UniProtKB/Swiss-Prot annotation:
Keywords: ATP-binding, Cell cycle, Cell division, Kinase, Mitosis, Nucleotide-binding, Phosphoprotein, Serine/threonine-protein kinase, Transferase
The protein's name in its UniProt record: Mitosis inducer protein kinase cdr1
Residues that hold ATP according to the record: L18, G19, T20, G21, S22, T23, S24, C25, V26, K41
Alphabetical list of Gene3D superfamilies matching this protein: Transferase(Phosphotransferase) domain 1
Species for this entry: Schizosaccharomyces pombe (strain 972 / ATCC 24843) (Fission yeast)
Length: 593
């Protein structure tokens, strides 16, 4: 039997707090049966719309990419069970130990680039690579790339126009607000990371943001005299202001700096060429998933690429995706099919990729299901979803209610929600959930109906039953693998921070953190690490926040994913701050010209 208490999220028992950000916190957790450790990232639902992030982390199986174990939710928070890396961020490691030797820096850089290349072969662009988003296992000398919150899928025939990232790691084309390709931008960020590993400071610093922007645009930085000529040459090529002439990841692996310092001389040593496939060997199910994942790709083009003798991304992704789907289907057989959301189902979730407007909304009433079914489109869509494993929660409830939290007060009380008349046209910038909690767990209002699921009428279900049933007695719902999430297709705003002008890593001071209403504030010396600057107009910036420096860089037509209650606004007006401050310079940069 599994003893459960209020500090249990599904099959995970919560422990100490590992870290706190502007909108989330991370707690250590232990699996109730196996004893395995995990880091539970807790995000309020009003800030969480992370379907694309979950999809990427399920697809990207790589030794240098952080693993996603599990996802749970209740009516207040999302709980992501991630791989636990006890030694923490690479940022803290460099801050503690100072500059690394060239051999050690090359060893870690090769792991970072190998993981980034793995992402790029899926056409995923991370767009927020930095020391704070890289975790390290010191004893194993292994790194893990984390936080795919700003990652996106980049079609081959188009550029990205969503400008986001961390100030000191931004590529010149992003700072200049030009349409850009994600792969060269990631290479630039890796160049900044290499510079930091070798010198214990960031290459682009200054007294204000204007100075930093100008240095980035012109590629103006000072190279430490202590590093070798091979390292200097690689830095010059990675920090090339022209993305078309910037070195690529395969070229980096062939560079003398990496070849002389590591045994990994090329990407071919870790990703051997994939043989061509005949038309009889090609699985149309896998090809279909590739076309949906890559949006504009045609099946004929993918099949032609799979039949070529030369190695290409299509052959690589086909091989990896077919293995994942096969393993996923084996797992699905151990679960009730109606309660397991396979990777195939997640890829084919229309809400994950489709952007459309909501046609009709109304307040939730006790008879909302009957009223909603007056729409034939809604009834047809509901019948389709009930016959599909896409929404396990729908099948378990007599009348599922797709809702969206419309404001903070509504989020707190669930007194007012909006009903979607046609789920097939859900805007993926909203955070939709299907409300059907078990009967022993009720909300504080009568407007939301409860479901009759009772965990097989057992007062203390076993762990196996907990893993196959998405509810537990405290109202937590397992959504991975159980039901689906909505997300944006081209990245989103994050409430993390922009960087302060201080370029030094070694000179950062410790901060005595005090937990105040879910936000971290300093009670001691002013922290010189990157600060938070939320761009939502009614959010208060926290100048002593110790989380990483991620933020959008301008008004963007893509609404917020984490700030889903503001998603109806096409653009954001930054909050005005005092004249002459760094925050005002940042806010002026956000304004559209």
């Amino acid at each position: 039997m599994v003893k459960r208490h209020k500090n249990t999220i599904g099959v995970w028992r919560l422990g100490k707090t590992l870290g706190t950000g502007s909108t989330s916190c991370v707690r250590l957790a232990k699996h109730a049966k196996t004893g395995d450790l995990a880091a539970i990232k807790i995000i309020p639902i009003r800030y969480a719309s992370i379907g694309m992030e979950i999809l990427m982390m399920r697809l990207l199986r790589h030794p240098n990419i952080l693993r996603l174990y599990d996802v749970w939710t209740d009516h207040q928070h999302m709980y992501l069970a991630l791989e636990y890396v006890p030694d923490g961020e690479l940022f803290h490691y460099i801050r503690k130990h100072g500059p690394l030797s060239e051999r050690e820096a090359a060893h870690y850089l090769s792991q970072i680039l190998d993981a980034v290349a793995h992402c790029h072969r899926f056409r995923f662009r991370h767009r927020d690579l930095k020391l704070e988003n890289i975790l390290i296992k010191v004893n194993e000398q292994q790194i893990k790339i984390a936080d795919f919150g700003m990652a996106t899928v980049e079609p081959n025939d188009s550029c990205l126009e969503n400008y986001c990232g961390s100030l000191h790691y931004l590529a010149p084309e992003i700072v200049s607000h030009k349409p850009y390709r994600g792969a060269p931008a990631d290479v630039w960020s890796c160049g900044v990371i290499l510079y930091s590993l070798l010198s214990n400071k960031l290459p682009f610093g200054g007294q204000n943001t204007d100075v930093i922007y100008n240095k980035i645009r012109h590629g103006a930085y000072d190279l430490p005299s202590s590093i070798s000529s091979a390292a200097q040459d690689l830095l010059h090529r990675m920090l090339d202001v022209n993305p078309s002439t910037r070195i690529t990841i395969p070229e980096v692996f062939s560079h003398p700096f990496l070849m002389g310092c590591t045994s990994l001389s090329s990407m071919d040593s870790t990703t051997p060429p994939t043989p061509s496939l005949s038309i009889d060997e090609i699985d149309p199910l896998v090809v279909d998933c590739m076309c949906v994942l890559w949006k504009k790709s045609s099946s004929k083009k993918v099949v032609r690429r799979l039949q070529q003798r030369d190695d290409n991304d299509e052959k690589y992704v086909y091989k990896v995706l077919s293995e994942i789907l096969r393993d996923d289907m084996l797992k699905k057989q151990r679960f009730d099919e109606n309660k397991y959301l396979s990777l195939y189902d997640l890829i084919h979730d229309n809400n994950l990729f489709t952007k459309a407007s909501i046609s009709t909304t109304s307040l939730v009433k006790s008879n909302v299901s009957t009223n909603s079914r007056k729409s034939s489109n809604f009834e047809d869509e509901l019948a389709r979803r009930v016959s599909s494993p896409l929404s396990a929660l729908n099948q378990m409830s007599q009348s599922p209610i797709p809702i969206r939290v419309s404001s903070d007060k509504d989020y707190d009380s669930y007194a007012c929600h909006e009903v979607v008349s046609n789920p097939s046209t859900l805007d993926d910038d909203y955070n939709y959930m299907f409300v059907c909690p078990p009967e022993e767990y009720t909300y504080s209002t009568d407007n939301v109906r409860t479901d009759s699921l009772d965990l097989q009428s057992l007062p203390t279900p076993t762990l196996e039953q907990l893993e196959s049933v998405p509810f537990n007695r405290y109202g937590y719902v397992r959504i991975f693998p159980s039901t689906t999430l909505s997300s944006t297709a081209s990245g989103y705003y994050t409430p993390d921070s922009l960087s302060t002008p201080e370029p030094s890593i070694d000179g950062l001071t410790n901060l005595d953190d005090v937990q105040v209403g879910g936000f971290v504030q300093g009670s001691g010396n002013q922290n010189r690490r990157p600060i938070s600057f939320p761009v939502i107009s009614n959010m208060q910036p926290n100048i002593t926040n110790v989380r990483s420096a991620s933020a959008p860089l301008c008004s963007s037509p893509v609404p917020s994913r984490r700030y889903s209650q503001y998603a109806t606004n096409a653009r954001y007006t930054p909050r005005k701050v005092s004249s002459g401050s760094v925050l005002r310079k940042i806010s002026s940069f956000f304004r559209k010209d």
